[in-house]
């Protein structure tokens, strides 16, 4: 490696410190150094394309955290590595291991948990699974990137103990235990300093204290300086072309502001990452990205969806006996297609299955009736891809030059490809010398409405755009007004009404061309709304009343939960709450399915026959849900976050200094009292507590024994079918030199228990179970003294409390 560094010119070295494109690092052909490619995860691997090429859509981070199953998460990591290889990707930008401070945060669904121990256990397995597959993880966002409000500028004001004891724990575990190969710095500041310019965090903690030898990558456009960032330890500015590193760094070296040895160290780390991920090896894939639909990976995705679903309430209704169900009403806006979160984690799935379809197959002898009931869109929703011909396919034709690619023009496209999403984005060069500011796109498909009447169609675009049906202009956005779409470079939504006939196929065409060659970004989002129907709410209630059982599928979607903005509150969008109440009034035999990425208010939960929290379960979610409803599988998830009764009940309360922040600063004054640690310490009951989740079995904790630091639990299933237990072990400090939470998760074991065979699980508590961060010694201390070990089924459902004496351990 030193030999290669010695052969590089200063310009070549510095070229390896910045992206060349949105997703790639430049190659150095004369030395055989190929380009490194990164891609968004963490819930799928999109590849370099942002125009709708298909990838397997995995369950979101909250669902993964809900599995409480590190072995399964390792398999998930392997499946993600396979997806990455199919796209020629060397680095997955994930997982997200930020701790959930407030459930209002827009990217809560990407995180694993509010608890640092659980997050760390899941993260370690995830990273090991991916990297054992020869693909790097870039764990993110380092550090305290816990809200979207002012995320590009906010300063997280956090004390040393809280930082180390809560927010850095998952990163530390990923480095020390999993050997993660890359870390992404966060957009925000910590205590007034940009995360990418924090020498104490990057060189001091990450590399010095933890021994990290990998690459430190900026979040996209999250670099703010040359000397400060380079000196702090940032290795790679993304995306390209660079603004602060790359050639600007070379100038800083030549002018004596940065020592060349600093650049050499960055290059060595880049070359090490390339070596670890096989860049340029015989097995390294070429640039072609495949849309592989692998059955093995799909099976893993379904298992994660199943084990990540939490049975919150069950009044004996689930599982349903298919033979006893003659009619079922499937109701709700997410019953037609389960939603996923928005932002950089979103991918275009291979499969679009509805809950109504999947349940209809499992309840083959029953009459299934679907009614939407209400809508949850924030403005117009993306056009329903099931109404687009060719299995939801557009043809994108590319034209050289910035002119409008009108239908019937003499110009011929130089290239064409199929895309599969209603939102398409081109960034940077389509090919060498042809940037997104210098070519145009014509997008075509057939559109077959499923309802007759007055539809609303619309466009948002980065660039100029026109929408045609059968050649006639329906929406004209050729003179766009600047809006918030496409990272603030796009237009406001332009929409119009058109009368359409159900079952008739229309030729749909979108013409998209640049507004300015100086903006290397071109994008379009096609939206549509069906004719308004004032009777859909009443019809949904009526079919529920007339059916043996009702399944109401509600939740959120990527318009409400997304990178870029937080949620305004914890309520279900639109009239969904009223719909649930009305259906429960009509039929108490109602299963409520919540398809959302973070906690929601559920004032109706105690009236429901059953409540399932599926999170965003990915493209296998509908079939996984149907299997669970009829008992072919069990929802074995447990909550990785607390569900408050109201948003202001949580640790950040209603104090705007703690959230969303005041004058560019957000205070972390809650300290170590995050999530359940807060609720248990102050004695407040959440709506659903951390670790909660029911089973289809009837499992009792028959014996609990704690000898020294070894915990042993015997479980007996008194039900008539196999059930799953997640034994949770908490520690309470009785003699602590610092204030501690009432209880802290220190271990867990997930196990299936058969009715005829008791199971015994064991867990050994090590020094980490008793530790706290000692500010005076700048390290962890496991203080000697009296403790209690709490063993239970959740943070509040404690089955045994056993006192023990811990002899202590030196600072480490």
Which stretches of residues belong to each language-model region?
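Glycoside hydrolase catalytic-domain context in secreted enzymes
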Residues: 1-775, 779-796, 810-812
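Short beta-strand edge segments in extracellular beta-sheet folds
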Residues: 803-811
């Amino acid at each position: 490696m030193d030999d290669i560094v010695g052969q590089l010119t200063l310009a070549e070295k510095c070229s390896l410190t910045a992206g060349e494109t949105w997703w790639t690092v430049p190659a150095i052909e004369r030395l055989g150094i190929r380009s490194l490619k990164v891609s968004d995860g963490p819930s799928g691997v999109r590849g370099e394309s942002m125009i709708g090429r298909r990838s397997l859509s995995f369950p979101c981070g909250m669902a993964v955290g809900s599995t409480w199953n590190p072995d399964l998460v390792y398999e998930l990591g392997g499946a993600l590595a396979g997806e990455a290889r199919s796209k020629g990707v060397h680095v997955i930008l994930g997982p997200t291991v930020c701790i959930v401070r407030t459930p209002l945060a827009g990217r809560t669904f990407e995180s694993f948990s509010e608890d640092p121990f659980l997050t760390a256990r899941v993260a370690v397995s995830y990273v090991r699974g991916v990297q054992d597959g020869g693909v790097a993880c870039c764990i993110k966002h380092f550090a305290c990137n816990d809200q979207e409000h002012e995320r590009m500028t906010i300063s997280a004001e956090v004390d040393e103990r809280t930082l180390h004891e809560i927010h850095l724990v998952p990163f530390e575990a990923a480095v020390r235990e999993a050997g993660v190969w890359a870390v992404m710095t966060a957009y925000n500041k910590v205590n007034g300093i940009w995360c990418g310019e924090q020498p104490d965090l990057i060189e001091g903690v990450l590399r010095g204290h933890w021994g990290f030898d990998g690459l430190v990558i900026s979040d996209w456009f999250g670099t703010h300086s040359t000397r400060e960032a380079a000196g702090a330890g940032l290795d790679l500015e993304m995306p390209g072309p660079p603004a602060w590193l790359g050639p600007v760094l070379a100038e800083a070296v030549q002018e004596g502001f940065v020592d060349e040895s600093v650049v050499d160290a960055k290059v060595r780390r880049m070359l090490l990452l390339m070596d670890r991920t096989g860049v340029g090896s015989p097995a390294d894939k070429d640039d072609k990205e495949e849309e592989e639909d692998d059955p093995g990976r799909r099976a893993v995705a379904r298992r994660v969806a199943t084990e990540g679903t939490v049975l919150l309430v069950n009044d004996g209704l689930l599982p349903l006996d298919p033979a006893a169900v003659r009619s079922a009403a499937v109701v709700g806006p997410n019953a037609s297609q389960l939603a996923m979160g928005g932002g950089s984690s979103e991918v275009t799935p291979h499969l679009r299955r509805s809950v109504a379809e999947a349940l209809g197959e499992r309840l083959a002898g029953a009459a299934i009736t679907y009614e939407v009931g209400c809508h949850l869109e924030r403005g117009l929703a993306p056009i329903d891809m099931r109404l687009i011909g060719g299995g939801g396919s557009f043809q994108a034709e590319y034209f050289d030059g910035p002119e409008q690619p009108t239908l019937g023009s003499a110009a011929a496209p130089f290239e064409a490809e199929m895309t599969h999403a209603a939102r398409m984005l081109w960034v940077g060069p389509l090919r060498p010398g042809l940037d997104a500011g210098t070519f145009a796109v014509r997008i075509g498909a057939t559109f077959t409405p499923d309802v007759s009447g007055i539809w609303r169609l619309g466009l948002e675009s980065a660039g100029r755009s026109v929408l045609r049906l059968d050649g006639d202009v329906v929406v004209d956005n050729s003179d766009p007004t600047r809006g918030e779409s496409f990272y603030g470079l796009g237009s406001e939504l332009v929409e119009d009404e058109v009368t359409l006939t159900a079952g008739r196929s229309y030729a749909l065409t979108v013409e998209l061309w640049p507004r300015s060659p100086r903006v290397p970004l071109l994008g379009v989002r096609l939206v549509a709304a069906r004719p308004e129907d004032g009777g859909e709410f009443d019809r949904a209630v009526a079919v529920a009343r007339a059916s043996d059982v009702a399944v109401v599928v509600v939740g959120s979607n990527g318009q409400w939960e997304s990178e870029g903005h937080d949620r305004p509150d914890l309520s279900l969008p639109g009239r969904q709450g009223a719909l649930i109440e009305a259906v429960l009034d009509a039929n108490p035999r109602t299963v409520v399915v919540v398809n959302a990425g973070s906690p929601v208010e559920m004032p109706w939960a105690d009236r429901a026959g059953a409540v399932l929290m599926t999170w965003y379960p990915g493209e296998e979610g509908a079939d996984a849900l149907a299997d669970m409803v009829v008992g072919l599988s069990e929802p074995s998830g447990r909550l990785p976050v607390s569900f408050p009764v109201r948003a202001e009940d949580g640790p950040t309360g209603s104090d705007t200094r703690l959230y969303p922040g005041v004058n560019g600063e957000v205070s972390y004054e809650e300290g170590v009292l995050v999530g359940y640690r807060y609720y248990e310490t102050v004695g407040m009951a959440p709506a659903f507590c951390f670790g909660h989740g029911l089973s289809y079995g009837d499992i009792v904790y028959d014996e609990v024994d704690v000898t020294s630091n070894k915990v042993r639990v015997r479980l007996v299933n008194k039900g008539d079918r196999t059930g799953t237990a997640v034994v949770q072990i908490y520690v309470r400090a009785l003699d602590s030199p610092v204030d501690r939470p009432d209880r802290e998760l220190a271990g867990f074991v997930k196990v299936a228990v058969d009715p005829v065979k008791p199971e015994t699980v064991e867990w050994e508590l090590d020094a980490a179970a008793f530790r706290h961060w000692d500010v005076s010694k700048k390290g962890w201390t496991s203080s000697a003294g009296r403790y209690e070990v709490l063993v239970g089924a959740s943070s509040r459902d404690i089955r045994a409390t056993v006192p023990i004496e811990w002899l202590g351990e030196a600072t480490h």
